[in-house]
Amino acid sequence: MPHPVTIGKRTRMSFSKIKEIADVPNLIEIQVDSYEWFLKEGLKEVFDDISPIEDYTGNLILEFVDYSLDDKPKYDIEECKERDATYCAPLKVKVRLINKETGEIKEQEVFMGDFPLMTERGTFVINGAERVIVSQLVRSPGVYYAEERDKTGKRLISSTVIPNRGAWLEYETDSNDVISVRVDRTRKQPVTVLLRALGIGTDAEIIDLLGEDERLSATLEKDNTKTVEEGLVEIYKKLRPGEPPTVESASSLLNALFFDPKRYDLAKVGRYKFNKKLALCYRIMNKISAEDIINPETGEVFVKAGEKISYDLAKAIQNAGINVVNLLMDDDKKVRVIGNNFVDIKSHIDFDIDDLNIKEKVHYPTLKEILDGYSDEEEIKEAIKSRIKELIPKHILLDDIIASISYEFNIFYNIGNIDDIDHLGNRRIRSVGELLQNQVRIGLSRMERVIKERMTVQDMEAITPQALVNIRPVSAAIKEFFGSSQLSQFMDQTNPLSELTHKRRLSALGPGGLSRERAGFEVRDVHHSHYGRMCPIETPEGPNIGLINSLGTYAKINEFGFIESPYRKFDKETSTVTDEIHYLTADEEDLFVRAQANEPLTEDGKFVNHRVVCRTVNGAVEMVPESRVDYMDISPKQVVSVATAMIPFLENDDANRALMGANMQRQAVPLVRREAPIIGTGIEYRAAKDSGAVVVARNSGIAERVTADEIIIKREDGNRDRYNLLKFKRSNSGTCINQTPIINKGDQIIKGDVIADGPATDLGEVALGRNCLIAFMTWEGYNYEDAILINERLVKEDRLSTIHIEEYECEARDTKLGPEEITRDIPNVGDSAIKNLDDRGIIRIGAEVDSGDILVGKVTPKGETELTAEERLLRAIFGEKAREVRDTSLKVPHGESGIIVDVKVFTRENGDDLSPGVNELVRCYIAKKRKIKVGDKMAGRHGNKGVISRVLPEEDMPFMENGTPLDIILNPQGIPSRMNIGQVLEVHLGLAAKTLGWYVATSVFDGANEYDIMDALEEAGYPRDGKLTLYDGRTGESFDNRITVGYMYYLKLHHLVDEKLHARSTGPYSLVTQQPLGGKAQFGGQRFGEMEVWALEAYGAAHILQEILTVKSDDVVGRVRTYEAIVKGENIPEPGIPESFKVLIKELQSLCLDVKVLTDEDQEIEVRESVDEDDTIGEFELDVVNHMGEVEESNIIEEIEDDFAENAEDEDIENLEEFTEDDLFEEEIDFDSDDFDM
């Protein structure tokens, strides 16, 4: 039975049967926490890595001691958006310069550039635009083994040792059993060559190290080197072909390649993965020992020969510092297993070392050295502190290389396991903090080079830290990252959900990731390890499918960057599921048996069924006895992302349609009249709160003042918090941001309460659409192919109206001929055109504008012309303006209109930061209310999308028995083949809930079932099948069959017909081919392509075809003459030669081919380059009526040439195109989409 639950300010009837153990974590913590880590630790790590910087003599040392970020940014967030500034704070670093010769120490605080700050909502404001840094999903550093079969079916093992940065090592086996190695992607050579180069010189030493093995013998046979020196030389030849090899250079190269922390870095995660993979204990457990294993320190026997090694013993053997174990195989063969010599420090030190903060395993030989050298506790601690970089090395060690080679040999005996690179245990997340850290590192390493050079050049005495440090490389690297990295994206701000999803997005693309073209099917596919970590539903359709994913609802990211999912612990002693929550990574969870969240439990937490459906090793789903269970899911919605969790009855939808539903919710435009869904899932409130679209109380207190613009809350300590609300601001996506208070004066407020609604929220819940009364029936064919028939009432009552705000800007620059001027005094413009401009020449707020209207009057100086004596005299007498100007005003573009809601003016005089060469900048904001109309796209939450085909008058719409007309009619045929049955259940439950006055929460995988819905329908007084009799609005007669009617939540998507409809008569042409440009943005024409030409050819419509290919396209002379003929009412003349044909001839001539055009009588046709001055069309004069209604004389060709010249003078021409008649005759075809029934 449904039970009431209070979510925020609204009570919903919940059908949930599972009690919520834990709240959803903060949904944007992946952004906020990562950036916080970067400021606290990430920056420190980079400075520690880079310092000290020494000069080439080792005399001067520069250290970065400490750093601080100023608390006070120059502008606040809103001001940054207005001024196109970056929301940032200055980074100051304390730098110490030590001169070893003189012992002099200089300290200075150095400014290291402005560092972008993250807003509370997890975004950055860069140059006035809100951006999001998307987290990247990359392959984790580590050692990976893969298996293939050759033609004969023989097992071939290949492996890769991947660092965070540095040279790769790749091992592979060929069909002759030779194991070879590639160093840093060079040509392969036997693996023994690498071992010799690393100091294990003779064959006997190598066999002694790795043990007897036929593969080793085959490899040694192929290896032509016999000593350490030969090995080094051989490696050097492959790494540096063509250079003369010497033993010294080879040795230093190999050292630099692998053992220099500056060149080779595993990072924390790489060391962790190496130790996990190469550790002895996982490889020898459950195997049989070939000899007695004795503790070297105490002499006790761990395991006798022939005994099985348990997991606990294996761990003890490893931690005792034993690194080599011989195992006995089934055929009595001995196999040697070599670990990488890392142990748990606590097994060797009996006093408390928690203050050293060592969580990882440590290198045993180094630890042994320390323990042998010191006996006092404090001394040992100090030694550990000073040698921490050797104990936990960030680069690869010889031990690691030997262990990885040993693993390669062992795998043939099934010791160790093959890795799956798509498993989330082997893929990690690089969040904002780490991505930024990498950029800063790049910047600092460039800076290091500059500092070293300056140290040698500058005078020793006068040198200061300030003079050495050049901050340009660092700030350039950061700027480049935020401005142009693939992972720094313009935030999708269509609605709160799209904003939240964007911040939780995981992308496998980007620098260091995959590319679309190379990504195969396996990488994109859903993997069993995605469960509870990445959503299997929400991913884009198209080329990025599976490469861009969304984080699971409850997922967190651990210190190594692996995604963790929460589970409830199952207590095996009491056989109950506890409320103790453990976060597990993908490879940890594989060791356990996990039950699903909707497995029925008794009141005291015991399983109802004794056999439980569980996920076991490698994601297999089995029925297991309850005693085998280790963990249980925490919530059914942990599997999916936030957007998917907002689809009610998700479990009844086909996955393909659910994917579309999740993606289309992100495209819903915020409505003027918002309404929360009647059928929700209960996560709406949390999504809105964490997205940052609503205003949340920072502290508890009492509301003292509540107006449309601000809320003031008096805190318990007597201070006041002021919240300024945003009114009619433009979002990144051109939708309207408007915040309205939802509390009253005198209300008691608790910290964390939502106190004001934002766009597309209602009482703090995400409200993307409207609850509409829907019937599934056909109506006169207007439902064909998913089309939607809507009631005119939705238009009249503004139920689906949205406000869109567009921004236009105009800048007055300095030109070569003088500065441009913003003014009301525009040449050749009538009073009617400037009636809405103020005395500065800028449109007033509140004016209604249409396309072509002037927003900002601006004039640009024109080139000085030679004046006649008379004109000079007149100018001298009347003091006329000495220079000619032309009108370059900002006009409303084609097809746009609306009301001016805001105008912002920035000038040099007021001290505003403007880009070079700009004296004044004006921004106008035009708001347009768009009602729903034919051609707009709408959708439900189940992937059921369609286009509006007709708006039917209210009286013609079918109506229910009580006289209520329907809002929307949908096609019932759209359901069976698409299998999104969730929409039908939503409609039925919606009908009952609306009648009973409920708001419902039906969570995913834990919501209402069909019997709950039938009971609710019955309670509301409807038949149990939810079908009702409808009556035809035109005749009043009832329809033959009963029809499914109910309430569905319907969204209006941002694919609006107004933004897509476009028509052109004349307009801009492309510069080279002289063909009309394409696309609405360029005010282009419709392309008449190859196939359309075939259609006309098939009809034999020769004249139309000729016109389309010449005078309507790129026959420059012909199109002017045609214009002339139309204006004068004469016959249209013969077409000339198209410009693109001339271009083709030029292309052929550029290949030294002499091309002539001949008639059928072999007479050569002269292809003219351009219009000559004395051509007849040059004499065509045309009366042009200007804006003032006066008749001017005008020569078309000159006008065209002038226009072209002016265009060429503009400094910032982006796409060079010639504007022709468009400037003279402004013609427009008015398309009213209501005339077309689609």
From Swiss-Prot:
It is an enzyme of class 2 (transferase). The RNAP catalytic core consists of 2 alpha, 1 beta, 1 beta' and 1 omega subunit. When a sigma factor is associated with the core the holoenzyme is formed, which can initiate transcription. Its EC number is 2.7.7.6. It holds the Pfam family RNA_pol_Rpb2_6. Keywords: DNA-directed RNA polymerase, Nucleotidyltransferase, Transcription, Transferase. GO terms for cellular component: DNA-directed RNA polymerase complex. InterPro entries: DNA-dir_RNA_pol_bsu_ext_1_sf, DNA-dir_RNA_pol_bsu_external_1, DNA-dir_RNA_pol_su2, DNA-dir_RNAP_su2_dom, DNA-dir_RNAP_su2_hyb_sf, RNA_pol_bsu_bac, RNA_pol_bsu_CS, RNA_pol_bsu_protrusion. The keyword Thylakoid does not apply. DNA-dependent RNA polymerase catalyzes the transcription of DNA into RNA using the four ribonucleoside triphosphates as substrates. SUPFAM superfamilies: beta and beta-prime subunits of DNA dependent RNA-polymerase (SSF64484). Belongs to the RNA polymerase beta chain family. It comes from Clostridioides difficile (strain 630). It comes from the Bacteria. This is DNA-directed RNA polymerase subunit beta. One of its GO terms (biological process) is DNA-templated transcription. The gene is rpoB. PROSITE patterns: RNA_POL_BETA. CDD domains: RNA_pol_B_RPB2.
